[in-house]
Amino acid sequence: MKDSMSILTQTPSETPAAHSQLHHHLSHHHHPALHHHPVLQHHYSLQQQHQQQQQQQPPAPPAVATTTVVNMSGSTTTAANLKPNRSRFMINDILAGSAAAAFYKQQQQHHHHHHQSHHNNNNHSGGSSGGTSPTHHNNNNGEGFEPPSGGAGAGAGAAAPPPPLHHLHPQSHPHPHPHPHSHPHPHALVHPHAKLAAGGGAANGLNVAQYAAAMQQHYAAAAAAAAARNSAAAAAAAAAAAASAAAAGGGGGGGLGVGGAPAGAELDDSSDYHEENEDCDSDEGGSAGGGGGGSNHMDDHSVCSNGGKDDDGNSIKSGSTSDMSGLSKKQRKARTAFTDHQLQTLEKSFERQKYLSVQERQELAHKLDLSDCQVKTWYQNRRTKWMRQTAVGLELLAEAGNFAAFQRLYGGSPYLGAWPYAAAAGAGAAAAAAHGATPHTSIDIYYRQAAAAAAMQKPLPYNLYAGVPNVGVGVGVGVGPAPFSHLSASSSLSSLSSYYQSAAAAAAAANPGGPPPPPPPSSAAAATGGSPSPIGGLIKPLAGSPTGGMPPHHPSRPDSASPPLPLPLARPPSTPSPTLNPGSPPGRSVDSCSQAQSDDEDQIQV
């Protein structure tokens, strides 16, 4: 607590106007409880002095904000007189500071809100989840519930406060309590340190209430294990705290958020981070969570508090953000670096069988000098990757089936209807028919490609679509159309890497007409215009005449070597096709399918 308190005192507080408003509100409440406890009277006089100081201060925010923590019984403790018991400066310190400043403003607004709505509550701990359920803060209205054992004792920090301390507040406003606190607290608030707080009541003087509030907070995480809780009211009214915390639905309500020990503010296990910079194991009440914005209005579902304790009282050293969840202090084992030989052996074994028996796994591990667990983990990861790739292959097959159905239904590409260049595409289809390659051949080849890719367990790049509906215009310059009809139909195979070349040759050989092709040349050789690529919606315009598309030396050039063709070279000006490629990036020349294909080459390396 000392540590987080001192951090919070370094953050500039709200201007004294807000303070004076808060104190003005507090000074309107009577405190009959004070007449029972000299220590608390002392605190109350301190509070009034402090209040006068705050009202006399100039509007500039004080350098060290002596923020006031108002306990249930009205006792105040100034947070400025505590020193950190640890010199390390951690990132949590910064977090605590900024969060404190932000939540301090928010809390002041909540004080104002409750002041206006006449809630009889001495400690207006910040509204639950942004003040949405202010009704749960009405802790002094005299409902007749008894505090759990130890709650009042540890909470108020006076020697032995009478249990109905929180009933003694006269009901100065007739505001009824809309939500009777009928929810029992998940765990009775039993504080192991209650005897410390009670014993040191007279001796500790000023620090008693603060220490007790720290105790209250320090074990709040243990006391409120799983239910959705809201920060409740005063340290002495531990019962009221418990009931309203259980009642408020899931609010990550902020504690008083000013001075680090918001009296009795329950620490939300589910709030985002609680600025606790102490080691959680220290028995001092110091690791009270929470300084400004101890329970934040942030994420109700993220990790539990930095220094929270689980139900057994064991400290949970969890990280402050969700990516350091659970036991972040536990060292993660480094990734296993496999050698090439190990990887090759594992891959071969995986190709043979996707699942290993225990005996096979042990043999493989022994052979590769790996542990059994490493082989098992590698196989699990490899199976996951394999399933993902198979899913992609099946997806491609399904899309190929849809595409074929469209083509059979409409006799053309489904993507062409909306384009103004449909006539060019129709001409392309006609040219394809004239050259003897029907669209169905290319579709069948596409089926085979996708099937081969799925069988090879290597995902096809989506760019494969760029060559899909190559309707096979089959324009080889100086070459008869017949031998090249199947070649242009299968030219989309050039978008596959050499890994698929055997499948490509088989697919082309299955085609009627012509010997199986060499490794497919660039599809620009086939001047496959007129048909779109479905994925990008690109139109590859049709080359106007059977001999007009490409320069004569082009067909012999292999795919990867062909540079992007400049526009005048790519198409003679007499071609009827559009001069722009509607969906393509601006840098790509219009008819150079070769460039598109070489792009596919680049992207296929998985």
UniProtKB/Swiss-Prot annotation:
- What are the protein's GO molecular function terms? DNA-binding transcription factor activity, RNA polymerase II-specific; RNA polymerase II cis-regulatory region sequence-specific DNA binding
Q: Where is this chain compositionally biased, Low complexity type?
A: 41-65, 119-138, 523-534
Alphabetically sorted, this entry's keywords are: Developmental protein, DNA-binding, Homeobox, Nucleus, Sensory transduction, Vision
Could you tell me which InterPro entries the record lists for this protein?
HD, Homeobox_CS, Homeobox_NK-like, Homeodomain-like_sf
- Principal subcellular localisation of the protein: nucleus
Q: A Gene Ontology biological process annotation?
A: visual perception
- The answer to whether keyword Nucleus applies is yes
Biased amino acid composition, Basic residues: 21-40, 108-118, 166-188
Q: Where is the composition biased (Acidic residues)?
A: 266-284
Pro residues compositional bias: what residue ranges? 513-522, 561-576
Q: Does the keyword Acetylation apply?
A: no
Biased-composition ranges for Polar residues?
A: 1-14, 315-325
Region described as Disordered: spans on this chain: 1-65, 104-188, 261-340, 508-606
What superkingdom does the record give? Answer: Eukaryota
Q: Which Pfam families match?
A: Homeodomain (PF00046)
Bias kind Basic and acidic residues: ranges: 297-314
Q: Which residues bind DNA?
A: 331-390
Q: Where in the cell is it found?
A: Nucleus
Family that this chain belongs to: Belongs to the Antp homeobox family.
Q: What does this protein do?
A: Functionally required in R1 and R6 receptor cells and primary pigment cells for normal eye development.
Instruction: Give the protein name, as stated in the record.
Output: Homeobox protein B-H1
Provenance organism: Drosophila ananassae (Fruit fly)
| Name of the gene this protein is made from | B-H1
